Design a protein with these regions (language model features):
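Short, Lys/Arg-enriched, disordered terminal segments
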Residues: 1-5, 19
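A "functional boundary" signal
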Residues: 15-234
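Sec-dependent N-terminal signal peptides
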Residues: 4-14
Length: 234
């Protein structure tokens, strides 16, 4: 889990230089530079976290203000210390429950599920999803809801050594992908990422690269988004 968190930190925290048609060696070179600067960015992130915690300590423990500050702390931690990110999401689930705020409770559960599946905690991720009442998922969270199911079952299908289970998990993931395609705009980043991944998995590299070119044109250089798009080219 620590290795996955380190990769998240590298993409979330460090400036990435332009290398639209460079090789994987170029990406590794940039990551090496990021690792060398790691201590500096850790100090900066820890400073932001301390400040947010100080602010959180000055507001009521069961309040929207505390929820929002916890959410900011979670975002700082999620690419830094995953265990702490999980803790603050669970705190927000508790706060939202105490407030009777179903929408925010579901929002935090979906964030938690995605974080858990991104760090290999698939059983825990599915348990969280099972605790979400589909009938209470509002329209602005339905995309996140489908994404969580698609992601966790897609990851399980990829990493399991059992081919029968792999096919089963991939079938579930594919069903949620279909649901996502039905509600996403073809011009959206999420839609294009899914199509690019599909083409790449089917070894249709020209089609995948064409979509990646469009994503790269829309991404601002020296940002985490630009880094992710260029990473997908390697």
């Amino acid at each position: 889990m620590k290795n996955k968190c380190l990769l998240l930190l590298l993409f979330a925290s460090f400036p990435i230089f332009s290398w639209a048609d460079e090789t994987l060696d170029s990406l590794l070179h940039v990551l090496d530079q990021a690792i060398l600067a790691h201590d500096t960015y850790v100090v900066q992130r820890e400073s932001r976290i301390r400040h947010l915690k100080e602010l959180a300590g000055d507001v009521a423990p069961n309040s929207i203000e505390r929820y929002n500050l916890n959410n900011q702390i979670y975002k700082e931690y999620k690419a830094f210390i995953c265990d702490s990110a999980i803790y603050y999401l669970n705190e927000n689930v508790r706060i939202a429950g105490n407030l009777g705020d179903t929408d925010r409770e579901i929002e935090s559960k979906l964030q938690l599920s995605l974080l858990l599946s991104s760090t290999g905690m698939y059983t825990e991720s599915i348990d969280v999803l099972k605790s979400v009442d589909r009938q209470k998922v509002t329209s602005h969270l339905i995309l996140d809801y489908y994404t969580c199911f698609d992601h966790v079952y897609g990851e399980m299908g990829f990493y399991t050594q059992d081919q029968t289970l792999s096919a089963y998990y991939r079938e579930i993931s594919s069903a949620y992908k279909d649901s996502l395609y039905a509600i996403l705009s073809p011009q959206s980043e999420e839609f294009m990422v899914m199509r690019e991944t599909l083409f790449r998995d089917r070894h249709k590299y020209d089609e995948a690269l064409e979509i990646n070119d469009r994503r790269l044109m829309a991404a601002e250089p020296d940002t985490p988004q630009y880094a992710l798009v260029t990473y997908h080219r390697s």
